[in-house]
């Protein structure tokens, strides 16, 4: 079951980020100290605040704390991108995801399971969306491998798509 405050998949619970929740603040602070935080975004605090505001406009963009076995393990961002034209191509509505898992839970194959489960769930929740996008830098081999194992395919540039089946 999923609500506006949380999304539940087989293995994970995604709770909407609460700026007053000390557990949520702690996960954010751990990620900010982690050297690969720039993979998530350069200014985590601003990104979280802006994403929570965007949710009021589109109802899809949001920031979530990821829970696995009742333990907070990271942060997920969902960003809605409406139909747009880029370089002469019309791109349909899409949801882009970005996630960061704290070091303690990395290298346990949670990333690929998490990406697969949240992508399937988002496509169930939003039937007009055809695919989920993950943007992964070329040098981030672990994340690219996790995305492929989760069912993503390479699209172009640094974009990988999880298509509706």
Where are these regions (language model features)?
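Conserved beta-strand-loop-alpha-helix junction that forms the acyl-donor binding cleft
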Residues: 121, 132-144
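Short, high-confidence coil segments that cap the C-terminus of an alpha-helix
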Residues: 61, 127-129
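A short, internal acetyl-CoA/4′-phosphopantetheine-binding micro-motif in the GNAT/acyltransferase core
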Residues: 96-108, 136-137
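Active-site beta-strand termini and strand-to-loop segments that position acidic
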Residues: 9, 67-69, 164-165
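Conserved acetyl-CoA-binding loop-helix of GNAT-fold acetyltransferases
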Residues: 101, 107-122, 144-149
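A short, well-structured alpha-helix characteristic of acyl/acetyltransferase catalytic modules
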Residues: 1-50
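Acetyl-CoA-dependent GNAT
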Residues: 41-98
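Conserved catalytic-core motifs of GNAT/GCN5-like acyltransferases
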Residues: 83, 133-135, 148-165
């Amino acid at each position: 079951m999923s609500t506006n405050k949380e999304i539940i998949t087989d293995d994970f619970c995604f709770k909407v980020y609460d700026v007053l929740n000390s557990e949520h603040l702690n996960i954010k602070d751990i990620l900010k100290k982690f050297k690969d935080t720039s993979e998530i975004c350069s200014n985590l605090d601003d990104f979280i605040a802006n994403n929570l505001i965007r949710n009021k406009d589109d109802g899809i963009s949001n920031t979530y704390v990821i829970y696995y076995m009742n333990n907070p393990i990271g942060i997920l961002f969902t960003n809605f991108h409406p139909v747009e034209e880029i370089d002469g191509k019309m791109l349909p509505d899409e949801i882009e995801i970005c996630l960061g898992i704290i070091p303690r839970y990395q290298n346990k194959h949670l990333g690929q399971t998490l990406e697969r489960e949240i992508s399937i769930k988002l496509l169930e929740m939003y039937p007009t969306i055809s695919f989920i996008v993950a943007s992964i830098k070329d040098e981030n081999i672990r994340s690219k491998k996790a995305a492929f194992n989760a069912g993503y395919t390479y699209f172009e540039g640094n974009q990988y798509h999880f298509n509706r089946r």
